[in-house]
């Protein structure tokens, strides 16, 4: 009856919903290519098949695959953070833990309420919830793949022994999740780090570049955090509107099937309009979630990683200044001068090493995020225009049918 929009699924196609959905403008390198070729959900666990192609001499084979779980990704991330050799680099943020509880709860509630709805309504809602679950699953896989690709693209981190073990060792890494005691220890470490961060933040940086970056990143992180929360609200609003269209369309359809009068035919035609409009609105929500919300969430975590880098450098600067003071005291007292000089030299070398790599890391971070935001925002704008035109076409076709023009 109404043309201008196909009757495809409510969620994005396989191509759009694929593992490349979260775009961070990664630079590919033929020497080491990593992707997640498959994933399997087993209750509360997801098993990722990590596929690697490499021409590097460090690996025994040119192509291989291993199965990894989320805890092993966290282990790899933590090993980077805890390694002093990587203090001058932005450590790619760890992927978030897979969370399907909300989708499972919706499916459970749907099953409990099956008796209160028609077979068609139940089938439609079941398909939508299953598609929603699949979308979350694909997003989870994508975020884990992005982490690996960021590491593989990094000229230093890609050489890490733990990373090679993660990619190549075809047995279980025997990594477990942290227990309550370890989580409590992490909590206190973060408290100490926060308090220490207040102390080092009051130290005037000797380099204007880093002073500017510290001020900028603090503001940038807060703005991205605020934008992420607002983007989520916007996405939920579109999803809520789609749900409302569904309920209105179902009610009109029920009215339209009561009789064969003209008013009932009118109800059926308008019901079809709401059904197709619902599909567009659901796609709008999905597009905004993929192209904007996911990107903001990723760069919220990566900007925190950049802030952590600046904290490590500031901490190193404070240690260097304290070492200088200790050396002056040792010389004044003519006691333990050699030990103080050695400590001062080590602190100086560490600070200079971190500063050298940190500057390039922050420059690359800016280039990467600007390219990613430009690409995703342009694509989102094009999709919004496409959906707006689709809505307009639907309304025009519906009016033409109701007016008897077609």
Swiss-Prot record:
Pfam families: PX, Vps5. GO terms for molecular function: dynactin binding; phosphatidylinositol binding; protein homodimerization activity; type I transforming growth factor beta receptor binding. The modification N-acetylmethionine is found at residues 1-2. Keywords: Acetylation, Cytoplasm, Cytoplasmic vesicle, Endosome, Lipid-binding, Membrane, Nucleus, Phosphoprotein, Protein transport, Transport. Residues 26-173 form the PX domain. Residues 2-179 are annotated as: Interaction with PIM1. InterPro entries: AH/BAR_dom_sf, BAR_SNX6, PX_dom, PX_dom_sf, PX_SNX6, SNX5/SNX6/SNX32, Vps5_C. Belongs to the sorting nexin family. This is Sorting nexin-6. The lineage of its organism: Eukaryota, Metazoa, Chordata, Craniata, Vertebrata.
């Amino acid at each position: 009856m109404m043309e201008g929009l196909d009757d495809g699924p409510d969620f994005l196609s396989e191509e759009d919903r694929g593992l490349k959905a979260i775009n961070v403008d990664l630079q590919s390198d033929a020497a080491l290519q990593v992707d997640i070729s498959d994933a399997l959900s087993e209750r509360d666990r997801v098993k990722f098949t990590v596929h690697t192609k490499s021409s590097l001499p460090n690996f025994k084979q040119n192509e291989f695959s291993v199965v990894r779980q989320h805890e092993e990704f966290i282990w790899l991330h933590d090993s980077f953070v805890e390694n002093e050799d990587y203090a001058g680099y932005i450590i790619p943020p760890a992927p978030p833990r897979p969370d399907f509880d909300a989708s499972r709860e919706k499916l459970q509630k749907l099953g409990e309420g099956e008796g209160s709805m028609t077979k068609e309504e139940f089938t439609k809602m079941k398909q939508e919830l299953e598609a929603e679950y699949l979308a979350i699953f694909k997003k989870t896989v994508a975020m884990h793949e992005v982490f690996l690709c960021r590491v593989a693209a990094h000229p230093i981190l890609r050489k890490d022994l733990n990373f090679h073990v993660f990619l190549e060792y075809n047995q279980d890494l025997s990594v477990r999740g942290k227990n309550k005691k370890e989580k409590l220890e992490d909590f206190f470490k973060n408290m100490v780090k926060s308090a220490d961060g207040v102390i080092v933040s009051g130290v005037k940086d000797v380099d204007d570049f880093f002073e500017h970056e510290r001020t900028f990143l603090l503001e940038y992180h807060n703005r991205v955090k605020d934008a992420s929360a607002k983007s989520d609200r916007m996405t939920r609003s579109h999803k809520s509107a789609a749900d409302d269209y569904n309920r209105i369309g179902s009610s009109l359809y029920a009215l339209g099937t009561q009789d064969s009068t003209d008013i009932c035919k009118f109800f059926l035609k308008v019901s079809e309009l709401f059904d197709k409009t619902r599909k567009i609105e659901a796609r709008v929500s999905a597009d905004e979630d993929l192209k904007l919300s996911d990107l903001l969430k990723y760069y919220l975590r990566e900007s925190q990683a950049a802030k952590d880098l600046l904290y490590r450098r500031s901490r190193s600067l404070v240690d260097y200044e304290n070492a200088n003071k200790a050396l002056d005291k040792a010389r004044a007292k003519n006691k333990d001068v050699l030990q103080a000089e050695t400590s001062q030299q080590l602190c100086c070398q560490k600070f200079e090493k971190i500063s050298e790599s940190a500057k390039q890391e922050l420059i690359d971070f800016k280039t990467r995020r600007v390219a990613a935001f430009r690409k995703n925002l342009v694509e989102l704008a094009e999709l919004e225009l496409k959906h707006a035109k689709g809505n307009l076409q639907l309304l025009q076709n519906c009016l033409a049918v109701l007016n008897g023009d077609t």
